[in-house]
Design a protein with these regions (language model features):
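Glycine- and acidic
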Residues: 6, 23-26, 73-81, 99-108, ...
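Non-catalytic terminal/interface segments that mediate subunit docking, oligomerization
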Residues: 66, 71-92, 113, 128-131, ...
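A structural-propensity feature for long, helix-poor, extended segments
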Residues: 229-232, 236, 613-634, 639
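Thiamine diphosphate
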Residues: 2, 14, 23, 170-193, ...
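Cofactor-binding active-site loop characterized by glycine-rich and histidine/acidic residues
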Residues: 73-102, 109-251, 274-275, 532-535, ...
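Active-site metal-binding loops of divalent metal-dependent hydrolases
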Residues: 227, 232-235, 262, 393, ...
């Protein structure tokens, strides 16, 4: 078996090696580097054909990717830029320390910005283009724990004031700054939320892809825009951070730049103490098809590497573990010499060739403005593939021996006076002893070179950054309800599902001249399941490269048609990626000044349960769009079983404040909800998004009852009344189970002469929110006339029991219990799902018509309206087991 080859194994034939290298150099010199690459590729292929089992080409030497000769000259004064950096470093640290001094519980992070500061400043001074009236700007996902530095820059620009900085993490009184990037809390400042960890990287990938989608569809020109994602090396362990790398390479997203801040530390300790995180990440990104730029060493190393012709130092560096390299930044000159030059005569000779001063100057590339500028310049110039910059830094850089490079750096909230003095001296911060002790914020004089440099650099790049647009310049003209007349009239005797009703509504919208081009249908490889294959040919499936093959079904009407101008995003089996596409579209009104209307349809079980963190971030990001949870309901999907049947997605959606949730039964309800959602989000520019569940069960859909529209939107309306005389019970239902409720009402009328009213509850969640809002108002306006909630007003006329049945766990319907004065009984599908027919499953969970009728009789028995003999008769008539186990535990 062939052993893997190491770059640094002993060379048994130096002359032969030299001949090969000289030949390669000749090809580069006399032909070009592309030809050299072609030859190397052919050689590697030939080697593998011989049976070689090793792994070649995924990592390179542990040195900078770009040679010193490629360093591009900075166009600014390094001295002025460093002076500006001193102000930023001080104010960022003072902000956190001042908050901690006020209340230690506030927390905050100092060390991350200290490590990434220079990279940010090179970006702000030379690369990050702002959005303005002339050009659209770049988009940036900033490393969450580093944002005090972003606030510090905004302070110097005059966007934030001292009071706001002093109120870092103190937001309740209205003059504070959010802990991390949160558009919900600072809507004109932050573009994207980036915590929790991992949501920034995956969101950035799909954001860059969506920019390309908009460009290829000729909606806007995005050629000059870049998406920047700043991540931590520890953050890359999150599956979301690396899970979508391939799509970025596959679609040649050269508008995307990742910058991984490799300070080698996560929250508790080293990221890879026994390994090398940079090499690991290089192999992953390179294997996925990305351009990898390693930014490891500062300019002081250039001389050493030039002298190291035989590669002895490179070899030494490659075998120093990260756990040991973590000490290098704060190590003494003597310790550095021992780490780098001990072990061989060649290394000792190399060490002897440089002075102690030169050894002390050896640092990491992530703190070298020149090296950063070269790396970023190369990244934005790269074509046909995304780029990652792996930048070596020190966590807590410049914060003193107690913090710099230490395992406690992440949680360091306090610095001693001596640490602050060290920081002041290290970066030449213009601050007096008294200002230092008081943690005063500092600004350069308005007429100083520093202030002028700051303003000039941002003016040349279009203005302040980051900044978020609250609304697009133009709102969309959305259709009124009359446009859905064919849906409102019912299915005219045909049996269809609400999913099919949605497809019909979507088809109507795709013919609306005002919004048809703004619609973005998104499906995670389930179009045929949902009956949406007709869209393949109608609007095309988006593909960055078009369709270079002949699909096997091309002769069919609804063949799989891919196009560079395609409208449908067919995401494959990838719910997280599909949601990120939806999120990019749902925030396009802000990020692109172009409102887009995304409809993401998916198995409801694989929505909030699977990507809840991203759904929460969507609320934070003020997303606007539609999520369609198809095949919803624990009994409605039937045969798919435990992992597929959804009985709780509405419980998850209810905790997101600006997620508006509905569970309609009939097509007219769906049409009313979607029309109202379009009006709210795209006509009125409300920062909400909609979650609507739909089923795959086919049945007839009646026309919309007169006067039902308001109730559908508010969350409830009376569907029908059965029987004569006084109402003895009120029955609530929604989704698939509303039809069981209707049958139950008929059973009660026919078998026991009990009159009932049946109500369609389109949204328990909206009813609860309205009731709680009224309760809050009444508690805090005790002298004003009390407000009555919508549900209380609708139930005012009843003094009988209310029975609610849904295809979800009881918690869903229990939301409104505090706001109902009547005796209230809920039926639901608590417990794990299982496979069987719909009828058997509904009987098992007790949400079938007979169980609903029996529960109603039991409620009347509890009120002493009927006797026990009626209950016993119903149990026998409806075959209700008296010893039935509770489904939660079965």
């Amino acid at each position: 078996m062939t052993k893997p080859v190491s770059r640094y194994q002993p060379d048994i034939n130096i002359l032969e090696t030299k001949e090969w290298l000289d030949s390669l150099a000749a090809v580069v010199h006399f032909v070009d580097i592309e030809r050299a690459g072609f030859l190397i590729t052919r050689l590697i292929e030939a080697l593998y054909r011989t049976g070689y089992k090793g792994n070649l080409g995924l990592t390179t030497s542990y040195c900078n990717t770009l040679p010193a000769s490629d360093d591009k000259a900075l166009s600014d004064s390094g001295e002025v830029a460093e002076e500006l950096s001193a102000y930023l470093r001080w104010n960022a640290a003072a902000m956190v320390l001042k908050a901690g001094k006020f209340a230690a519980e506030l927390g905050g992070h100092i060390s991350t910005y200290a490590s990434i500061s220079t990279m940010y400043e090179v970006g702000f001074d030379h690369f990050f283009k702002a959005d303005n009236n002339i050009k659209s700007g770049d988009l940036a996902y900033f490393q969450g724990h580093s944002i005090p530095g972003i606030y510090a820059r905004a302070f110097l620009e005059g966007r934030l004031d001292e009071e706001q900085l002093s109120n870092f993490r103190q937001e309740v009184d209205g003059r504070g700054l959010s802990s991390y990037p949160h558009p919900w809390l600072m809507p004109d400042f932050w573009q994207f939320p980036t915590v929790s960890m991992g949501i920034g990287p995956i969101s950035a990938i799909y954001q860059a892809r969506f920019l390309r989608y908009l460009h290829n569809r000729k909606l806007i020109d995005t050629t000059c825009r870049h998406v920047w994602a700043f991540c931590g090396d520890g953050e890359m362990d999150e599956p979301e951070s690396l899970g979508a790398l391939s799509i970025a390479a596959r679609e040649k997203l050269d508008n995307l730049v990742f910058v991984v801040n490799c300070n080698m530390q996560r929250l508790d300790g080293p990221v890879r103490g026994n390994g090398k995180i940079v090499q690991e990440l290089e192999s992953i990104f390179r294997g996925a098809g990305w351009r990898v730029i390693k930014l490891l060493w500062n300019s002081a190393w250039d001389k050493l590497f030039a002298l190291d012709a035989a590669g002895h130092l490179k070899q030494k560096l490659e075998f120093i573990l990260d756990g040991d390299m973590q000490r290098f930044g704060s190590a003494s000159v003597q310790d550095r010499r021992a780490m780098l030059f001990a072990g061989s005569s060649e290394l000792e000779a190399l060490g002897a060739s440089i002075s102690d001063k030169e050894v002390a100057a050896l640092g990491f590339g992530g703190h070298d403005r020149q090296k950063i500028y070269a790396a970023f310049s190369e990244a934005v110039a790269t074509q046909d593939r995304p780029t990652v910059v792996l930048a070596h830094t020190i966590k807590g850089y410049g914060l003193g021996k107690a913090t710099e490079g230490m395992n406690i750096a992440h949680n360091q909230k306090k610095l001693s006076v001596s640490d602050l003095e060290h920081m002041r001296d290290r970066f030449s911060i213009p601050i007096t002893d008294k200002q230092l002790e008081n943690l005063d914020f500092i600004k350069p004089a308005a007429d100083s070179k520093v202030a002028g440099y700051l303003q000039t650099r941002r003016q040349e790049l279009g203005g302040s950054f980051p900044a978020r647009r609250l609304n697009a310049d133009q709102s969309l003209t959305t259709p009124d309800l009359n446009a859905f007349e064919s849906i409102l009239g019912g299915s005219e005797g045909r049996s269809i599902s609400t999913t099919m009703a949605f497809v019909r509504i979507l088809s109507l919208l795709l013919r609306d001249k005002n919004i048809k081009d703004r619609i973005v249908p998104i499906v995670p490889d389930e179009s045929r399941t949902f009956g949406m294959e007709g869209l393949f040919r109608q609007i095309g499936i988006y593909s960055a490269t078009g369709q270079d093959y002949d699909p096997v079904d091309k002769g069919q009407i609804m063949y799989y048609k891919e196009s560079q101008q395609g409208q449908l995003l067919e995401e494959g089996i990838n719910e997280a990626g599909a949601f990120c596409s939806w999120l990019a579209a749902a925030t396009s009104y802000s990020n692109n000044n172009l409102p887009m209307i995304p409809f993401y349809i998916y198995y409801s079980m694989f929505g909030f349960q699977r990507i809840g963190d991203l759904a929460w971030a969507a609320g934070d990001a003020r997303a606007r769009g539609f999520l369609l949870g198809a095949t919803a309901g624990r009994t409605t999907l039937a045969g798919e079983g435990l992992q597929h049947t959804d009985g709780h997605s509405h419980v998850f959606s209810s905790v997101i404040p600006n997620c508006v949730s509905y569970d309609p039964t009939y097509s007219y309800e769906l049409a009313v909800i979607m029309q109202h959602g379009l009006e709210r989000m795209y006509g009125n520019n409300e920062d909400v998004y909609y979650y609507i569940t739909m089923m795959n069960e086919n049945y007839e859909h009646p026309p919309m009852p007169q006067g039902a529209q308001e109730g559908i939107i508010k969350g409830m309306y009376k569907l029908k009344a059965l029987g004569h005389g006084k109402r003895q019970a009120v029955l609530f239902g929604c989704g698939a189970i509303l039809r069981e409720v209707e049958v139950a009402a008929k059973l009660l009328q026919d078998d026991y002469n009990i009159a009932t009213d049946v109500w369609s509850i389109t949204s328990f969640t909206e009813l609860k929110r309205n009731a709680e809002k009224c309760l809050h108002h009444n508690m805090h306006n005790i002298s004003a006339k009390p407000k009555k909630s919508y549900i209380a007003a609708e139930l005012d006329v009843y003094d009988c029991p209310v029975i609610a049945a849904t295809d979800y766990i009881r918690t869903f319907a229990e939301q409104i219990r505090p706001h109902i004065k009547n005796p209230y009984h809920t039926l639901g599908t608590d417990g794990y799902g299982r496979s069987d027919t719909r009828a058997k499953l509904r009987e098992y969970f007790g949400v079938d018509a007979k169980s609903i009728a029996y529960t109603t009789l039991y409620a009347l028995y509890q009120q002493q309206i009927i006797g026990i003999e009626t209950i016993e008769d119903a149990a026998a008539r409806y075959k209700i087991a008296q010893d039935k186990e509770y489904t939660l535990y079965t």
